[in-house]
Design a protein with these regions (language model features):
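Face-selective signature of the C-terminal outer-membrane beta-barrel domain
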Residues: 121-139, 167-205, 211-356, 374, ...
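Residue-level marker for the onset of beta-strands and adjacent loop->beta junctions
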Residues: 47, 105-107, 327, 412, ...
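Conserved C-terminal beta-signal and adjacent last beta-strands/turns
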Residues: 522-545, 551-656
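Transmembrane beta-strand segments that form the barrel wall of outer-membrane beta-barrel proteins
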Residues: 26-40, 60-64, 344-352, 412-414, ...
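Outer-membrane beta-barrel translocator domains and adjoining extracellular loop/strand segments
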Residues: 4-6, 73-79, 142-158, 200-209, ...
């Protein structure tokens, strides 16, 4: 309410009103299902229980979900705690499976999942309310994969073939508690969040004739408090935000490969950020000034045992702190068909490194400008340009070796390094709601200048990735476009999306600096329609390629095709039939394609207004492998992933 007449939302408001007979009563939904599967060769289950009660003083929603059918419940937990990560730290140990492009995640997820969630809302006097949310997830998943990795080298390419089976156990407990006041004079909200997760991964591998075992323990503990205040004193608008966050990651990796190798890491930090914003509207001009400060206190320790000392230092013990001040003036102007915005953030960082003899003082200036011209009520052109300097990447700030998986070692920098960027983008947006035609096109060019250079060396059976303090440049082209239009004669619509990315960069490979280019194109066309009340249908076709070019070493380009369709038929009132199919054609190496066809079917029958019975048949043709190849930094990885086999599932849905 405090932003009324100042800020507009594109999200529609939804007001729900319960019938009198439904108030103060529990509303419950139950879903229970069972079936069989060819891979994994075991029984299937799927269950959901949803309970809700609405009272004048309080409201509650509680649910329990469980399945082993490939439905990912982890995303539902992450949605509750999702938010911007100000520190952007990552795990140093990384032994998990990579995501599969194009293919739905449930196809490759062999899981056994349980999720419990309960949320409460208490309404207080004077437009105050209290909310709480608690979630607990228990998940066990397995995966089977084969990979063939090629590292392109000036002398002779190195090829590594792996077969692995993994078992992952995850326990995650999240809690969210908030207090909110929404008044015309001010808005106040305080969020207290915590996330405790335990992730254990066991991997048995076969590389050529060698047997390898990996055991990774990756717990992560996080607590944060976020305060937001908005006030409207007259024509002025004042806001204040405060974020305090702490995180601890005590993680370990154990490798059995001829001998025992142990990697331990401890990464912990406390981060605080406070910011105030004062703005005023002066005719067509909006003027605002934001200022604040932040601080980070971080310790990183690691130790590596079981490798020869000749590879390098095996210990890290770093303390990295910084204090920062920020000031951001902003101007916004709107006159008839013209709009413009200017921002000029100025930041000061004081870094203190326990391992360095001197501290570091850094000033960062990141101005940007945005202009929009409405040539007609339906069409506008836009232009955006700016400069930016990113602060030090703390994740790469270490000097000793860290084992990320059984074969890969990494080494960072022991001194400050920054990345300076420039960008220029422009495009247009056209919308004609009457005819149902919408178009958006954007072209962006960017340049990056970095103080650090990534490199890769090979030592016996290990691959060492590292950073060195050396100036390097890269540049990128990005083109995005989308067009959608109503098709009245089909009672549907059609559209096309295009994404093109081209990047030029360099790296050090075995002491030689090598320039390379990567590119990708992804286009998707779609069309859907309806025939009376009987049939709904849709068809989608996607084409893409990814490319890797390196001077005198490699010039590769691989293509991918995907066709998919879905249709829903209602032959009689109580019967609903759904069919869905996918055809993938992936080029895994030059002129060698792998094809796979997947077909699913589902039939639902409404027994009563509160009861429905459904039968689902997944992967009708019982396909077992999905193959694809992706390019990296002077490397390519050919993947073969095991997918879920033919499955039959019966579900009963009851509304109590």
């Amino acid at each position: 309410k405090a932003l009324q007449d100042v800020s507009f939302s594109s999200q529609a408001a939804v007001n729900l009103r319960l019938k009198d007979k439904s108030k103060a009563k529990w509303v419950m939904n139950l879903l229970a299902g069972g079936g069989i599967s060819t891979h994994p060769d075991k029984g299937l289950w799927s269950g959901e229980l949803f309970a809700m009660q609405m009272k004048k003083e309080w409201q509650n929603i509680t649910l329990y979900k469980t399945n082993n059918t490939g439905k990912n419940l982890e995303t539902e937990v992450n949605d509750f705690i999702a938010g911007k990560d100000p520190v952007k730290l990552e795990d140093y140990i990384n032994v998990g499976n990579v995501s599969v492009p194009y293919l739905e995640k449930g196809r490759t997820l062999f899981n056994r999942s349980h999720l419990f969630s309960t949320g409460w809302l208490w309404g207080l006097k004077n437009e105050w309310e209290i909310r709480s949310q608690i979630n607990y997830l228990n998940d066990r998943s397995t995966a089977e994969a084969e990979t063939s990795t090629t590292y392109y080298r000036s002398v002779q390419d190195r090829i590594i073939h792996e077969e692995k089976q993994s078992v992952t156990h995850t326990d995650q407990l999240t809690a969210h508690f908030s207090v909110e006041a929404n008044k015309e004079a001010f808005y106040l909200k305080n969020n207290l969040k915590t996330s405790l997760s335990w992730n254990d991964i066991n991997i048995s591998m076969q590389e050529d004739a060698s047997g390898i075992m990996q055991q990774a323990s990756q717990p992560q503990y996080k607590v944060s408090n976020d305060l937001q205040l908005i006030k409207r004193p007259g024509k002025w608008l004042f806001s204040f935000t405060a974020l305090n966050e702490g995180q601890w990651r005590p993680q370990s990796l154990r490798v059995e490969w001829g001998n025992t190798i142990r990697q331990r890491t401890k990464d912990r930090y406390f981060y605080t950020h406070e910011e105030a914003n004062l703005g005023i509207q002066w005719g067509r001009l909006n003027i605002s000034l934001a200022g604040g400060g932040s601080a980070l206190f971080r310790d990183f320790d690691s130790s590596l045992e079981g490798l020869p000392d000749s590879l390098g230092t095996m210990i890290n013990a770093l303390t990295t702190n910084y204090q920062s001040l920020q000031l951001t003036p902003k101007l916004e102007y709107k006159r008839k068909r013209w709009e413009g915005k200017l921002e000029a953030p100025l930041q000061y960082y004081h870094y203190s490194f326990a391992h360095a003899a001197t501290n570091k003082h850094v000033y960062l200036f990141s101005p940007s400008a945005y202009f929009r011209w409405h040539t007609t009520p339906k069409l506008y052109l836009f232009l955006r340009a700016g400069l930016s300097t990113d602060p030090c990447d703390l994740h790469s700030l270490y000097n000793g070796l860290v084992m990320t998986d059984y074969r890969t070692l990494s080494r960072g920098l022991n001194e400050y390094a920054a990345v300076k960027s420039r960008f220029l983008s422009g495009g247009f947006n056209y919308k004609n709601p009457v005819k149902g035609l919408f178009t958006h096109v954007m072209v962006m060019r960017s340049w990056d200048d970095s103080d650090k250079q990534y490199g890769r060396d090979f030592s016996d059976k290990y691959i060492i990735g590292y950073y060195t303090h050396h100036p390097t440049t890269s540049n990128n082209w990005t083109i995005m476009g989308t067009v959608t239009s109503n098709l009245d004669f089909l009672h549907g619509m059609a559209g096309i999306n295009v994404m093109y990315i081209n990047s030029e960069q360099s790296m050090i490979s075995e002491n030689d600096r090598t320039s390379f280019r990567t590119g990708s194109l992804h286009t998707t066309g779609r069309i859907n329609g309806r025939i009376g009340e009987i049939l709904n249908w849709q068809y989608r076709v996607s084409y893409g390629w990814n490319r890797l070019d390196a001077d005198e070493q490699v010039n590769r380009k691989l293509e991918q095709w995907c066709h998919s369709f879905a249709m829903t038929v209602v032959p009689v009132t109580r019967v609903n039939v759904q069919l869905a199919g996918e055809y993938y054609r992936n080029e895994v190496s030059e002129n060698i394609f792998k094809d796979i066809v997947l077909l699913d079917a589902k039939c639902s029958y409404t027994l009563t207004p509160h009861t429905e019975l459904s039968a689902t048949l997944m992967n009708v043709f019982n396909r077992k492998k999905y193959s694809y190849t992706i390019y990296g930094q002077l490397s390519s990885v050919e993947h073969y992933r095991r997918i879920r086999g033919r499955e039959f599932l019966l579900n009963l849905y009851v509304k109590l």
